[in-house]
Structure formats: structure tokens, C-alpha cells
A protein has these predicted regions:
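Substrate-binding cleft of secreted/luminal carbohydrate-active enzymes
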Residues: 162, 232-248, 261-342
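Active-site groove signature of glycoside hydrolases
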Residues: 122-125, 147-179, 309
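Aromatic-lined substrate-binding rim segments of carbohydrate-active enzymes
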Residues: 60-126, 180-206, 250-261
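Catalytic domains of carbohydrate-active enzymes, especially glycoside hydrolases
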Residues: 58-84, 226-236, 299-309
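Boundary/entry segment of secreted carbohydrate-active catalytic domains
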Residues: 27-80, 210
Length: 342
């Protein structure tokens, strides 16, 4: 489960960059397209709006510019609405509080940088107590659809808007029978996804997770096979390394099992398999570049995994984000790694 919580100028170290700030210093060049093997690097990241209600357009422009500099081309908005709050100019009885500029400004920045955005729907924290509650699933599917209809009315024209993200994270310990997965799939995921495809037919994604103390590779395989019977075009798997759900020595086995479930046990799934790579430690600090390189090697080394996105750039790699200097060190080290591949 997620926590809610190179040209390089020799005399201008990367720590001078400003994530979300106004910074006139020269920016390092982006990795050249076609020069970096995308099976060795991150190409996307999640973004949360919790601490960004009042960001100006220039701050969003700078943040996405700095993401693009290290090769990220995809932004996944974790949620457009959370609990009682919405981050676009829409009115709902279930989200009375509004931060109406965040989503609009992020999309404008993404258009400027020619980046793709997957927009997350509505999430309420009571999901964790109601994962198999059919009445709850029905109600919150309707709420997700309401948010999607409003988002599409406002931003459906945006060239940066490439897909949807269902922010409810399924896992095999809660959905531990075929019947429970089918209930989640049919009452919730398919109800949302079928409507999304009527609205604009953009791809729909979700991010599953697992805990190796509770789930074997074989159980994850079968769970992924059952989940992928849903109307989904992208299924991500959270690697669990940051939250301590798996030891590195077991990581490849779980990813191979997940891929086998998606494409062998369920031969009908035609969608993509992405890895959601955690760039933090159990103490929530930014991880080391050595660990992240190992994660990339193991996860993208599984043939069916087509893309690696991180959770998440702003907290773990942005020098003016919550972890400041430590995040800046990781960003510098990761940027150097990407440049070394060219």
C-alpha cells in the first residue's frame, strides 16, 4: 500500500534546480530521445496534490520541466479528488472542499512539455475497511464516474490527457478468492472503466500491490490473472521495496509470477504491464541510487514489463520538496546514471 504521507554545467550543480520554484539558473539538457534504453530507466512518476493547492503555473512548469530533464514523460495524478476535497473546478456533495487550480495547471504544464498525463479519479480512505463491501464498491464506483465526467468536461480537449487511473489499490490478501476478485472487478472496476470508455475511450490503469509475508508468488500470479479479466489497459504492480513488503532477493520471482498470471494464465489480457517502483525507504527518506538501479534491473528485466514509473519524484528526487538535500542528491545521482547510458 502506498504511503499517503547529460550536459551538466560544471559549476552549477543540480542541487541548484528548483522543483516547483522560480529558478533562473540554466537547466541541464534532457536525455536525447532514442539514446537511452527505456528498459533501464524510469519514464514516469506519480504526483499528489496534497501540498500543492496554491501552486502558481510557473511552479508546475518548473516541476514538470525538471521531471522531463531526467527522462520522465508520463505523469500519473494519484487522485483528482480525495476524501472531501477536489482539485479541479467541480462541485460534488461528497467533496465540498475545493482546490480548483491544481489539475488544470498540471495539465497546462504537461502540454507545454509534451508529457502524457493519466488522471486519477476519486479515493476515500474508507476503502481500506471496505475492500470487499459490495455496497461501498457500488457507491464509490458512482463517485468515480461523477468525477470522471466532470474532469472530461473540463479537460477532455487537452492533448496531454492520455488516460485514466483508478486509485483503489487491489491486493491478493484482501481479494483472496476468485469470488472476491470478481466482485471488485465487476461491481467496481468494470463499472467505472466501461463508463470511461464511453466518455472518451482513453486507456484505464490501476496499481496492484502485495506483501511477501502474506502472499506467495503463485498466489500473486493467480490474483493478477483474475484481476486482468477486468476492462483494464494498464496494470501496474507496486514493487513493495520501499515499504518493506519484499526483500530484493525475492523481487524478480514475484514479477515473473505476475507476468505469468497476466499473459499465460490469462491469455486474453492484451494490456500493458508497468512497474510502480518505490524510490523511498521504510523510514520514508529517499532511497540510494544503488538500490534504485537494482530495482530497475530486476523489474525491467522481466520481459513483459514495458514501463517503469516511480512513487514518487516530488518527495524523493526534488531538492525543494519535503526531503530537500537528500532528494537532490538522489536526483543528481540518477541523472548521472541516465547520462551514463547514452
Amino acid at each position: 500500500m502506498k504511503k499517503y504521507f547529460l550536459f551538466i554545467a560544471l559549476f552549477f550543480p543540480l542541487l541548484m534546480c528548483s522543483c516547483g520554484g522560480d529558478d533562473p539558473t540554466p537547466k541541464p539538457k534532457e536525455p536525447e530521445k532514442g539514446k537511452v534504453n527505456t528498459r533501464m530507466v524510469l519514464t514516469g512518476t506519480f504526483v499528489e496534490f496534497f501540498d500543492k493547492d496554491n501552486w502558481e503555473q510557473s511552479q508546475w512548469n518548473n516541476l514538470l520541466d525538471e521531471m522531463k530533464q531526467i527522462g520522465l514523460n508520463t505523469v500519473i495524478v494519484q487522485f483528482a479528488a480525495f476524501n472531501d476535497k477536489v482539485w479541479y473546478d467541480g462541485n460534488n456533495a461528497f467533496t465540498p472542499n475545493k482546490g480548483k487550480f491544481a489539475l488544470a495547471r498540471l495539465l497546462a504544464a504537461a502540454e507545454q512539455k509534451q508529457m502524457d498525463v493519466y488522471i486519477g479519479l476519486y479515493f476515500d480512505n474508507s476503502y481500506w475497511q471496505n475492500q470487499t463491501n459490495e455496497n461501498w464498491l457500488r457507491l464509490h464506483a458512482e463517485r468515480c464516474i461523477t468525477v470522471a465526467e466532470q474532469v472530461n468536461a473540463l479537460f477532455g480537449h487537452s492533448p496531454a490527457f492520455k488516460g485514466w487511473y483508478i486509485p483503489h489499490e487491489p491486493e491478493p490478501n484482501a481479494y483472496n478468492t476468485d469470488e472476491k476478485v470478481a466482485s471488485f472487478r465487476n461491481l467496481f472496476v468494470n463499472k467505472i472503466s466501461n463508463r470511461l470508455h464511453q466518455i472518451n475511450n482513453k486507456p484505464v490503469s490501476i496499481a496492484a500491490f502485495w506483501n511477501s509475508d502474506l502472499t506467495s508468488p503463485q498466489q500473486l500470479q493467480h490474483f493478477m490473472a483474475e484481476l486482468s479479466k477486468a476492462n483494464l489497459q494498464v496494470i501496474m504492480l507496486q514493487d513493495g521495496v520501499g515499504v518493506g513488503h519484499v526483500k530484493m532477493i525475492k523481487l524478480a520471482d514475484y514479477y515473473k509470477a505476475a507476468a505469468k498470471g497476466l499473459y499465460t494464465e490469462n491469455t486474453a489480457y492484451q494490456g500493458e504491464f508497468w512497474t510502480d517502483l518505490e524510490t523511498f525507504t521504510v523510514s520514508e527518506l529517499p532511497a540510494s541510487i544503488e538500490r534504485i538501479k537494482q530495482q530497475l534491473t530486476l523489474e525491467l528485466g522481466v520481459d513483459k514489463v514495458s514501463k517503469a514509473v516511480s512513487f514518487q519524484y516530488y518527495k524523493n528526487m526534488c531538492p525543494t520538496g519535503p526531503y530537500g538535500r537528500e532528494a537532490g542528491k538522489l536526483r543528481q545521482a540518477y541523472f548521472n546514471y541516465v547520462k551514463s547510458l547514452q
